[in-house]
Amino acid sequence: MSGAASAWFSVPRPQPDAEFTLYCFPYAGSGASCYFQWARAFEAHGVEVRSIQLPARENRLRDAPLASIDAIVAALVGLLDNGNSRPFGFFGHSMGATVAFELALARQR
């Protein structure tokens, strides 16, 4: 994972041999840590959980927050293709679901 991507993605239990990557988008006001227990639960099933860490949350408190979902999507769209050819999916809760949906649409364009 590149330096730019590593700020955005928190991987609590890296699995280089995982069969699937699940990108998890937190609800508004939350950070990547809300999905850390998922990483342990999915590990036995060959799934690597990558939690999205937005600016101005948890370990990124000094980073300026982004003002819109479009800005978040624009920042993330180029970071997902990092040489990882395994299948992946998105999960988002509340605002995170909207970000995940808009990111999926942006990747199709």
Feature annotation, model-predicted:
Residues 1-109:
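Domain-scale detector for complete catalytic domains at protein termini or as standalone homologs
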